[in-house]
Amino acid sequence: MRKWIAMLLAMMMTFSCAFAEDLVFTGEVEEAGMTDEEIIEFMYGRYEASSLPNLVLPEGKKDVTVLTHYDLGPAKELYKELFGGEVIQIICGVQEYASKLQNLIGAGTVPDLVVSESTTDPCFVTLANAGLVQPIDAYIDYNEPELLDLKSVYEAGLWNGQHYLAPYDNKPVYYMIYNSKLFEEYGYETPWELWEKGEWTWDAFRELAAELNITDENGDYICYGTGAPGYGSLTGSTGVDYVALKDGFFENNLTHPDVVRAENYLNDMLFKDDIIKIKAQGGWRNYWNRGMVAMQIIDSWMLKGSAEVSQAIQEGTLGIVPLPQDPQKVQPGVNVTYAQSGGFCLVQGAQNPEAAAAFIRTIAYSHRYPEVGETYEDMLAEWHEDGWSNDLLYQYQVARDVENMVTSFGYGFMSTHRVWVFLAIQNNWTTFVESIRPLAEESLRELMGETTLAE
């Protein structure tokens, strides 16, 4: 795994580059640096021209009222610029959605949309079974250019033959980041280099995490291989969700052999084999800031919302890579992990459903196209201003490629049933599941009413 071997092999290869899906990011391209044209083509070249800017909404039917637990940000201004309508927010907590909708509908002040994400609990099924939201099929088409790459996520949210969840984005639950400076200093191939060779697996992660636990002459740690990962971070690469949403029922996979195998593997790294050191488990941010953590699995929001990550980007030491893949299922270049979709449900009795659909399209559009009067070069310049290099942007795009990801509906459900406790104590997954299974199954039955729970 020593880096000089990879460098020697790289010197024997000829430089090549290509656009769009033919672009292969090799070590020598990384050293030479991707051009602005290459990264723009890779990030945005697959999107055809959208008809959204030419869409006309009826007068008096342009405003959209949204029940949400977060501010909808710049998309509100873009929607107003495109359509002349207002986006009106009603803020409340996720757990309040059902009761808030009941009250609003009862009072005759019906919002058009309610935020719904695949990883939140309760999920959209709760709202659908209660008659609080309606199918959105008649109002939105996921063959539109800005929605096309979300079509598989749209289909994943099928419930009783109809679509209730309308996603505007999909991303991994987690990313893996690493400190490239430490890998160079200690002479190891980076996770990205292993990913490029199709060798970035649980076993490779485990080996690097162990070998990069480095002490000085006094026995004090000067480098930790990794801190504590999030729950489900390895399980996602098996392609099996804890509780999988099917069309009309949930499939309980808590005792699925792949889930058992992944959960026990990570628990062993934490406790049985003492690879993830106790000091780095809860305090990885402190050690990361001091340049003492080689790799870390982080929540996806942290990639753009964490001071620790932002600092590493500015310093040029950050690397991004897909999570380690299941060694029994790994395919070179295929990123399998849990994904989470941001989206909305159309509220029963919504006054402006066409405008609601246009707003969903607007958010998706804002992630994929320049704003009015801007260019793709302007979009790239904003990334550069934040310290992102073209090569880091390439890694980011590969790590967030959702084509083979599992849109997880069980992740949020299991969070409320304390699945994360399993990573806090040495345990066996099968034994642990028996302690939470009765309550989990009861909750699923409540969620689905009379709908079948598949074993």
Task: Give residue ranges: language-model regions.
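Extracytoplasmic/periplasmic solute-binding protein
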Residues: 114, 158-169, 174, 184, ...
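Extracytoplasmic/periplasmic substrate-recognition and gating elements
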Residues: 310-381
